[in-house]
Regions:
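A short coil-to-beta-strand element that immediately follows conserved catalytic motifs
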Residues: 83-93
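Conserved Nudix-box catalytic region and its N-terminal flanking loop in Nudix hydrolases
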Residues: 39-78
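Short strand-loop junctions, especially beta-strand C-caps/beta-turns
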Residues: 60, 131-132
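Acidic, metal-coordinating catalytic segment for phosphate/diphosphate chemistry
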Residues: 1-34
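Active-site-adjacent beta-strand/loop module that shapes the phosphate/pyrophosphate-binding cleft
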Residues: 93-117, 125-127, 131, 145, ...
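Conserved hydrophobic "DFG−1" position in protein kinase catalytic cores
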Residues: 37-38, 46, 110, 128
Length: 153
């Protein structure tokens, strides 16, 4: 890990904490799109973010008018360097309260994902994991989402 990477983690974490303080005051309604991205070998792509702990599905926020499938693809381009993909479909939508936000999380299955990792301000590391042998350190919400989506494959 480079010096820049080492310094970025606490800066990004502090920025995320400030965002959460703002959400505590405002209690916004938000929309998220999260990709259950499978490689051609059926490996699940997970990311480790600089500002949050645990392995997570690639994803992020989107506007109310943006199609969640398009938002998931945008997030895959930004976070893992998406090059191409196969079938894409909505697995489910979940209403949840996260960090003082009322969030509608769209879980999107994206198959046959090909990507070329590149450096990112947001993503510290990318891995591929077998659905039968998920890595230690999954974020709790990620574990829950994987269980929900796996039942729909």
């Amino acid at each position: 890990m480079s010096l820049a990477d080492t310094l970025l983690r606490p800066i990004m974490f502090a920025g995320h904490q400030m965002l959460k303080a703002g959400w505590f005051v405002r209690r916004p309604r938000t929309f998220g799109a999260h990709a259950f991205a499978l490689t051609p070998d059926r490996k699940l792509i997970l990311v480790r973010l600089r500002y949050a702990s645990g392995w997570r599905l690639p994803g992020g926020g989107h506007g109310a008018a943006e199609d969640p499938r398009e938002a998931a693809l945008r997030e895959l381009r930004e976070e893992i360097g998406l090059i191409s993909h196969g079938r894409i479909r909505l697995a489910c939508e979940l209403k949840q309260s996260v960090h003082f936000k009322q969030d509608l999380a769209s879980l999107i299955i994206v198959e046959d994902v090909r990507y070329r990792p590149r450096w990112s301000w947001e993503v510290e590391r990318i891995i591929e994991a077998s659905l039968d042998h998920l890595p230690e350190g999954l974020a709790p919400i990620t574990r829950k989402w994987i269980e929900i989506i796996s039942a729909r494959l």
